């Protein structure tokens, strides 16, 4: 078909409408109409044409012909060489004329693009070209793709820095760099560096990983022969003991396989922050880094000290990231006036703390932990005013800390009439179980500047509404409320979730995450980036394995080589679209032959088939289930309606208030109503009409908030056009979306946001995302990204483990159990094994408790689980023991974990297994099957104690979790004494079985040694109550066993009957 004929025939009219998005097809720069497809002339606008080429099938929706590249448009893979590369290169990168026009922009308080009113920050599009900018409406229909790079700047410092790094890497000769003074050559070098990947995968060296895999296979073979030997050689004089031990060993083998297979191909990753800066943060241009919203959650400020929460917030506000792209939301689920006043003081102190951190680039940027460091703080500091300003800042922080302590002391005793705010009005949250929603914006509005006149990141206090009779779903419900509030106020495309006791230890942590999330290829497939948890304030020997190094440095790296690490509840950067239940984009295979390769008589068949292909392609990001499918289909039309609607009307509503009334937002007149949408259908074509009617399905899924629904359709982040015109109306809309009844009859907690149904909502939420096909990434920068506090006290540590295990049991008993959920989906098999291991590990406590009891029983009764310890049995036992040691040693070799950390992990696996995990199994069964709810308590976070750094370590707190391990220790000690005494007094036929029994008993006690040491505390004595309970249980067990004596056959003699003879 002739292109000219198409152009003249199809575009005689002055205006043509794009058949994809419904917008007008704009003319080209030379005034001629834009024709996307030269074969059929199907009307498609330039933005849709470029998006289809970069993200879609690259084919025309009507004739299925592959789109050819138009001059000035970015290249994609598969484009033919048209001989105009050099001209396009100069035109795309604009080396000669870097200037361009910027559209006017009016500053708005809650605008995520710009707050200075000078020029809007460029928006970033996930998965878009690496060096491109986008402007225009939020719908993406009017977006005009800009040039991939703008040249003409000197950037001398960056060039020198780049040359130095390249010389160190051996990629650049020093002589060449000295001679290369030409400006254009420097620019081309920067272009080449900026186009390099932002990250790379670093596999484990084969010299370390291959022996590890070989030993795993050998251990599996040895394990099979060992189990065969154990099953085929029963102990006839102790069948119950033998049967119990074999069942335990079979379970341990299955548990080991589930734990070992996901660690088959571990990987590590490294990032390139300099390339990120060259690509998205170039000097003299608006920053194009993606905005991010921080979420901090807290429940009880008396258990979670406000000074710790304040330090977390301060470290967020001082993060090394553009201030207009950072927002911090603090969720107060306890509606505490103490936290409200604390954040007010924190916002005031941040005006001095944030510029101090950025001026001297200090780390960490949490003042409590920065000033408590026992290091040379003058190292690498060259500013002469640093010492003086640091001394002044430390004094100001101490004064700030005293004010916070005064607030805490005041909050200890609540007045009878309730708390009263400074203006004399009663505090709305006096009743923590019945109060309205509250929102307060401290920073981020105009006028909230630091002492140097620079802007500060946004800081927002949020306390969701609570009413009797509603299930608030604890932390998961609070996080979902923050998702909705942030979407209404800022709507950043990424969300970083932190616990209140986890501060930002690496100010560049967000940039580390953006190296993955803003990557051209990987970013659009990622649901979250997970950072490892690191802790402060742990004793040097880590008695109770609080650091959990084995999990974070071994298991998580193994998962990163499959589909990604699990979500661990904090230190995670989420893709907002993944939280909304959308599927990741599905890569479609390009057809080997297109229409222009077939004869003309086949074109109609191809077009018919292409129609189906185009239809299926529209649902590229369908929801996770239920009504989630097809959410992308009405996106363009619905956004077009909001855009046209915003030109006529603005958001209504009165002035913003701190707290909504008892009916909250229900009386508030919203700007977009469903009735108005239905009335506005007249005059639209069929495509737009069907798109607008899908508003009802959106409300069933996301809730009845048109502003929030519109924000979910903006993939790039940012507020819908016109929504930011009235900040007061946005506050009222935000109060509406945190009302207690908002989630009724919606998909929140089921398919959207944090998933309900378990106290470990983190595991469930990550599992749902991976089932949809999303991937996650494990980021381990050299400097820990975040650090938190861990419960170093034995009782608190066991209660923490109890809560985790209880959540796993709840997931096991739910429909989301990995054993039977989402088969046929996009969850990889090894990833399913890993999730299965995370929910079945509490059940290991039952065979573990039995196996730790068997050695003592054998010593008390003189029986053994093995009939005869012959040479073959000895070989299998020794081979299994050596394979376990070899696996552990090689695992430490490739992971870098110390042997002490590995041994502490093994010890606490036994301690937690026979205590917290055991209780979690029974509590979980009672909760799920019997309906008996077990309320979990928040683990207390102790503030820093300068008098005794580890005073909490020796503090004893009574809990029933201490009884089973103590009983095991006493039983095994009694068994050792009884076994040795019996051998000495009565002799022993064979010392081999005796040594085997003694070895197993000592092995149990050795694993429980940290627990025993914790019971003794500082005074080296076990609490009386624990001793009494344990001795009582051990005595009852021993007496019953001796009385029954099940392994000694009853003597059967002749039956005596009266014979009638006197004898």
From Swiss-Prot:
Observed phenotype of the null mutant: Plants develop a brittle culm (bc) phenotype with a reduction of up to 75% percent of cellulose content in culm.
List of residues binding Zn(2+) 1: 18, 21, 45, 48
Enzyme class: transferase
CDD domains per the UniProt record, alphabetical: mRING-HC-C4C4_CesA
Record: residues binding Zn(2+) 2: 37, 40, 60, 63
Record-listed Mn(2+) binding positions: 475, 499
Cofactor: Mn(2+); Zn(2+)
Subcellular location: Cell membrane
Transmembrane segments: 214-234, 238-258, 846-866, 872-892, 908-928, 960-980, 992-1012, 1022-1042
Free-text remark on how the cofactor is bound: Binds 2 Zn(2+) ions per subunit.
EC number(s) from the headed UniProt entry: 2.4.1.12
Pathway: Glycan metabolism; plant cellulose biosynthesis
GO annotation (BP), single: cellulose biosynthetic process
Bias kind Basic and acidic residues: ranges: 141-154
Recorded family membership: Belongs to the glycosyltransferase 2 family. Plant cellulose synthase subfamily.
Identification of the protein by name: Cellulose synthase A catalytic subunit 7 [UDP-forming]
Species for this entry: Oryza sativa subsp. japonica
């Amino acid at each position: 078909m002739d292109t000219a004929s198409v152009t003249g025939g199809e575009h005689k009219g002055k205006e043509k409408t794009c058949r994809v998005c419904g917008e007008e097809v704009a003319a080209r720069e030379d005034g001629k109409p834009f024709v996307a497809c030269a074969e059929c002339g199907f009307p498609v606008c330039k933005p849709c044409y470029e998006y289809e080429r970069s993200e879609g099938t690259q084919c025309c929706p009507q004739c299925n012909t592959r789109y050819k590249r138009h001059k000035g448009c970015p290249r994609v893979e598969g484009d033919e060489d048209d001989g105009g590369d050099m001209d396009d290169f100069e035109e795309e990168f604009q080396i000669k004329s870097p200037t361009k026009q910027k559209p006017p922009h009016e500053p708005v308080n809650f605008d995520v693009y710009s707050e200075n009113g000078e020029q809007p920050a460029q928006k970033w599009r996930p998965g878009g070209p690496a060096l491109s900018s986008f402007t225009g409406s939020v719908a993406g229909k009017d977006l005009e793709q800009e040039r991939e790079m703008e040249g003409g700047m000197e950037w001398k410092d960056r060039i020198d820095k780049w040359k130095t790094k390249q010389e160190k890497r051996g990629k650049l000769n020093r002589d060449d760099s000295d001679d290369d003074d030409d400006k254009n050559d420097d620019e081309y070098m920067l272009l080449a560096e900026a186009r390099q990947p932002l990250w790379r995968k670093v596999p484990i060296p084969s010299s370390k990983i291959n022996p590890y895999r070989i030993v795993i296979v050998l251990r599996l073979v040895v394990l099979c022969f060992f189990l065969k030997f154990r099953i085929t050689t029963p102990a006839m004089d102790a069948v119950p003991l033998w049967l119990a031990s074999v069942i335990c060993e079979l379970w341990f083998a299955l548990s080991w396989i589930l734990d070992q297979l996901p660690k088959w191909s571990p990987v590590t990753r490294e990032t390139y922050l300099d390339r990120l800066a060259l690509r998205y943060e170039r000097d003299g241009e608006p920053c194009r880094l993606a905005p991010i919203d921080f979420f901090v959650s807290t429940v009880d400020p008396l258990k979670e000290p406000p000074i710790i929460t304040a330090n977390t917030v301060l470290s967020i506000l001082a993060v090394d990231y553009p201030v207009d792209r950072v927002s911090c939301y603090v969720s107060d689920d306890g509606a505490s006036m103490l936290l409200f006043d604390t954040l007010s003081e924190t916002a005031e102190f941040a005006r001095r703390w944030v510029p101090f951190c950025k001026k001297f680039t200090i780390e960490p940027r949490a003042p409590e932990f920065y000033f408590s460091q026992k290091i040379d703080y003058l190292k690498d500091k060259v500013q002469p005013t640093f010492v003086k300003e640091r001394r002044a800042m430390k004094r100001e922080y101490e004064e700030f800390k005293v004010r916070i302590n005064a607030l805490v002391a005041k909050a200890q005793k609540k007045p009878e009439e309730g708390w009263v705010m400074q203006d004399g009005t009663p505090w709305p949250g006096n009743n923590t179980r019945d109060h309205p929603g509250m929102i307060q914006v401290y920073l981020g509005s105009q006028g909230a500047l630091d002492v140097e006149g620079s802007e500060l990141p946004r800081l927002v206090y949020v306390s969701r509404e609570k009413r009797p009779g509603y299930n608030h779903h604890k932390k998961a419900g609070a996080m979902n409320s923050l998702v909705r509030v942030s979407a209404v106020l800022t709507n950043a495309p990424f969300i970083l979730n932190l616990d209140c006791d986890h501060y930002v230890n690496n100010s560049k942590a967000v940039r580390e995450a953006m190296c993955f999330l803003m990557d051209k290829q990987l970013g659009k497939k990622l649901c979250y980036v997970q950072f490892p948890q690191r802790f402060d304030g742990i004793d040097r020997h880590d008695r109770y394995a609080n650091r959990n190094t084995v999990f974070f440095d071994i298991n998580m790296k193994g998962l990163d080589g499959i589909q990604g690490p699990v979500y661990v509840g904090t230190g995670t950067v989420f893709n907002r679209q993944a939280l909304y239940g959308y599927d990741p984009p599905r890569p479609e295979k390009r057809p080997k032959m297109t229409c222009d390769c077939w004869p003309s008589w086949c074109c109609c068949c191809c077009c018919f088939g292409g129609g189906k292909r185009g239809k299926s392609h529209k649902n590229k990001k369908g929801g996770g289930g239920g009504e989630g499918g097809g959410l992308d289909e009405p996106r363009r039309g619905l956004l077009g309606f909001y855009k046209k609607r915003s030109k006529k009307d603005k958001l209504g509503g009165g002035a913003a208030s701190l707290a909504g009334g008892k009916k909250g937002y229900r009386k508030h007149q919203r700007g977009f109503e469903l009735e108005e949408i239905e009335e506005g259908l007249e005059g639209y074509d069929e495509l737009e009409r069907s798109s607008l009617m899908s508003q009802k399905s959106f409300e069933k899924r996301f809730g009845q908030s048109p502003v929030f629904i519109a924000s979910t359709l903006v993939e790039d982040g940012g507020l819908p056009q016109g929504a930011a015109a009235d900040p007061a109306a946005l506050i009222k809309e935000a109060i509406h979306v945190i009302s207690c009844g908002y989630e009724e009859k919606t998909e929140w907690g089921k398919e959207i946001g944090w998933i309900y149904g378990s106290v470990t909502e983190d595991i469930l939420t990550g599992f749902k995302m991976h089932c949809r096909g999303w991937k996650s990434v494990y980021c381990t920068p050299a400097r820990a990204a975040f650090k938190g506090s861990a419960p170093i006290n034995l009782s608190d540590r066991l209660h923490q483990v109890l809560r985790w295990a209880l959540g796993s049991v709840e997931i096991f008993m739910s429909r989301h159990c990995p054993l039977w959920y989402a088969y046929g989906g996009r969850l990889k098999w090894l990833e399913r094994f890993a999730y299965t291991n995370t929910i079945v590990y509490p059940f290991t406590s039952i065979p573990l408790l039995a196996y730790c009891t068997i050695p003592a029983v054998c010593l008390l009764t003189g029986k053994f689980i093995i009939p005869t310890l012959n040479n073959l049995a000895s070989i299998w036992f020794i081979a299994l023991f050596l394979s376990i040691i070899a696996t552990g040693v090689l695992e430490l070799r490739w992971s870098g974990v110390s042997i002490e950390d590995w041994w502490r992990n093994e010890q606490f696996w036994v301690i937690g297994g026979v205590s917290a995990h055991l209780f979690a199994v029974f509590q979980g069964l009672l909760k799920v099957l019997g309906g008996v709810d077990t309320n979990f308590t928040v683990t207390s976070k102790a503030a820093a104690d300068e008098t005794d750094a580890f005073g909490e370590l020796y503090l004893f707190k009574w809990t029933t979790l201490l009884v089973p391990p103590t009983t095991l220790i006493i039983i095994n000690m009694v068994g050792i004494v009884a076994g040795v005494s019996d051998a000495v007094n009565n002799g022993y036929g064979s010392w081999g079985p005796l040594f085997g029994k003694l070895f197993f008993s000592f092995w149990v006690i050795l694993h429980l040694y940290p627990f025993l040491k914790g019971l003794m505390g500082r005074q080296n004595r076990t609490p009386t109550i624990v001793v009494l309970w344990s001795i009582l249980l051990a005595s009852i067990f021993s007496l019953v066993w001796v009385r029954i004596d099940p392994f000694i056959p009853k003597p059967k003699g002749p039956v005596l009957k009266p014979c009638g003879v006197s004898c």
